[in-house]
């Protein structure tokens, strides 16, 4: 049994010693079978939340009404959830009623996808009532039971299914795909914030191209903000988003590949409810994709935008990242004599004193001239040198 599980075994032991069932469940069990890195460890039990709290010294109530208590053990936190059934879903996303039960099988049958609906006992034996193991072997994504019922319960499960397809490279079961196309309108009941989380994970998946094609074939894209079919060109579908780093790079690539101008890009990202900072960064990165770089452009962009937009340019044209080119760009940026206007040896106040003039738009214009001269190494970034240069410029204008 893998290390993350062995660390949590004392929790199962405690529950067993007091007469309760306890199993590892969910994504961690799936990832064991896939040979992937194990993430969070979740535990399911027939002990009620109150009982779980009484058995462990350190717990956190994160949703007792839905059966979940966090148990803190040896510096780690584990979600311990009581076996339950759910009925009468509201808004196609949350159960109206939750009933605690004593059957592991019934608890597993309420879950979304077969690959997520397996359990593992304390000895490492897999309990699979839904064919999850077989679906992993066949590389297939399908719901537990009737897909229409699962999507009626929580419409976001449609996007989750395609997100797992993107991450794992599996195929979508035919009946699951058919139900998606039929019930796609239910996604209108899901908040943009929840859809955004799934979309970001989908875009970062190794098999994103396959997932985007499924979004199109099932017409799910019609229920997502700002995605119009005529903009979903091959370049958008085939771009390797998973090779990018931050979400600002991912969204920057998206708006560039959708062919949105800056005004439309801002509206598109606002529809997706991006934070102000993430939106601003994504738009800036997109602005400089395919840029012909010089000192002024590097100064305007800044190091992060420079490297991020260059990465997107490389991936767009070559589908790979050239790290030597990125390193060369970083060296060029580091060699700039100034990185911000504040680095200039003169300020607006200095210019006002030197010119003996009051404030006005002339200050910004003159600072811009000085900035360009310094960036192109035509002028040393020293106050005295700048004042001499400005005097020489004045004399030239007079002579002209």
Swiss-Prot record:
Q: Which residues bind ATP?
A: 27, 30, 111, 154, 157, 160, 163
Organism, per UniProt? Bacillus pumilus (strain SAFR-032)
What family classification does the UniProt entry report for this protein?
Belongs to the tRNA nucleotidyltransferase/poly(A) polymerase family. Bacterial CCA-adding enzyme type 3 subfamily.
Q: What does this protein do?
A: Catalyzes the addition and repair of the essential 3'-terminal CCA sequence in tRNAs without using a nucleic acid template. Adds these three nucleotides in the order of C, C, and A to the tRNA nucleotide-73, using CTP and ATP as substrates and producing inorganic pyrophosphate. tRNA 3'-terminal CCA addition is required both for tRNA processing and repair. Also involved in tRNA surveillance by mediating tandem CCA addition to generate a CCACCA at the 3' terminus of unstable tRNAs. While stable tRNAs receive only 3'-terminal CCA, unstable tRNAs are marked with CCACCA and rapidly degraded.
Cofactor or coenzyme needed: Mg(2+)
Which InterPro entries does the record match to this protein? Bact_CCA-adding_enz_type3_sf (IPR050264), CCA-adding_enz_C (IPR032810), CCA-adding_enz_firmicutes (IPR023068), NT_sf (IPR043519), PolA_pol_head_dom (IPR002646), PolyA_RNA-bd (IPR032828)
Q: Which UniProt keywords apply?
A: ATP-binding, Magnesium, Metal-binding, Nucleotide-binding, Nucleotidyltransferase, RNA repair, RNA-binding, Transferase, tRNA processing
Q: Which HAMAP family match?
A: CCA_bact_type3
Going by the entry's taxonomy, the superkingdom of the source organism is recorded as Bacteria
Q: What else is known?
A: A single active site specifically recognizes both ATP and CTP and is responsible for their addition.
Q: What is this protein called?
A: CCA-adding enzyme
Annotated SUPFAM superfamilies: Nucleotidyltransferase, Poly A polymerase C-terminal region-like
């Amino acid at each position: 049994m893998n290390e993350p599980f062995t660390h949590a075994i004392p929790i199962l032991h405690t529950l067993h010693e007091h007469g309760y069932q306890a199993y590892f469940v969910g994504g961690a069990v799936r990832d064991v079978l896939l040979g992937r890195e194990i993430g969070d460890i979740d535990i399911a039990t027939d002990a009620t939340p109150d009982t779980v709290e009484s058995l462990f010294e350190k717990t956190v109530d994160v949703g007792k009404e839905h059966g979940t208590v966090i148990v803190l053990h040896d510096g780690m936190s584990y979600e311990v959830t009581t076996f339950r059934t759910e009925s009468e879903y509201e808004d196609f996303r949350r159960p109206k009623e939750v009933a605690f039960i004593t059957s592991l099988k019934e608890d597993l049958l309420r879950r979304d996808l077969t690959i997520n609906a397996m359990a593992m006992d304390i000895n490492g034996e897999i309990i699979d009532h839904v064919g999850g193991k077989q679906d992993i072997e066949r590389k297939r994504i399908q719901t537990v039971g009737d897909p229409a019922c699962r999507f009626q319960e929580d419409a976001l499960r449609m996007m989750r299914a395609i997100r797992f397809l993107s991450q794992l490279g599996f195929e979508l079961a035919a009946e699951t795909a058919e139900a998606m196309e039929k019930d796609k309108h239910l996604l209108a009941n899901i908040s943009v914030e929840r859809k955004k989380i799934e979309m970001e994970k989908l875009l970062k998946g190794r098999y994103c191209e396959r997932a985007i094609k499924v979004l199109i074939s099932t017409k799910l894209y019609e229920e997502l903000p700002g995605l119009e079919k005529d903009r979903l060109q091959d370049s958008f579908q085939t771009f390797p988003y998973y090779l990018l780093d931050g979400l600002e790079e991912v969204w920057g690539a998206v708006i560039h590949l959708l062919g949105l101008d800056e005004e439309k890009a801002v509206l598109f990202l606002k529809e997706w409810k991006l934070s102000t900072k993430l939106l601003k960064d994504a738009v800036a990165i997109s602005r400089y994709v395919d840029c012909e770089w010089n000192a002024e452009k590097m100064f305007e962009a800044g190091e992060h935008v420079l490297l991020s937009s260059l990465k997107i340019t490389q991936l767009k044209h070559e589908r790979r990242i050239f790290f030597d080119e990125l390193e060369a760009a970083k060296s060029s940026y580091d060699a700039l004599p100034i990185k911000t206007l504040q680095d200039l040896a003169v300020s607006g106040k200095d210019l006002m004193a030197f010119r003996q003039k009051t404030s006005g738009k002339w200050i910004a214009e003159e600072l811009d001239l000085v900035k360009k001269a310094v960036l192109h190494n035509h002028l040393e970034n020293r106050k005295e040198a700048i004042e001499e240069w400005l005097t020489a410029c004045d004399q030239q204008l007079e002579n002209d």
